[in-house]
């Protein structure tokens, strides 16, 4: 018979259950927001670049459909210059102009709307490059000190609500641009991604971007 330390078992179960509480709350918040109002905003403000349902057909503009509510909400807030600050946490001239006019409710509603849309994923066009990206995504690169991407974003790139964004099915052009921005410091709102991206070679960035575009 295997003997168990009840205190250890209870502690593990408590941590396990506790880890789901933020996710449940965020899902509840997404549905408590007014997605219909978000849809109206999306059609008026966002459709030209991201499409009305968030499935952008412009490779340099991200697909927003199916992205986590919490991630979308955070990014829209990062594009705003908050009181007491002289710049936005995430600098982008176009998004600064749009996000600056959004209220807190607008951000909630837009985030809820896009998170509830079904993604029409992009695709990999270079299979050999995608295979090279898969190796980095799943195993990382010990020599360069790069952890596996799947350890945070999951084996299918779906992320974890409230912690890590969905990255599968995203346009390769946008993903490569994002990783490059983290690498050169022009996007500085995530210290963890800046540290990891700084170790990626240009070839690894392009390979990862290609792999993620076709990951389902």
Describe each PLM feature range:
Residues 36-47, 137-150, 159-177:
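Sequence context surrounding c-type heme c attachment/ligation sites in exported
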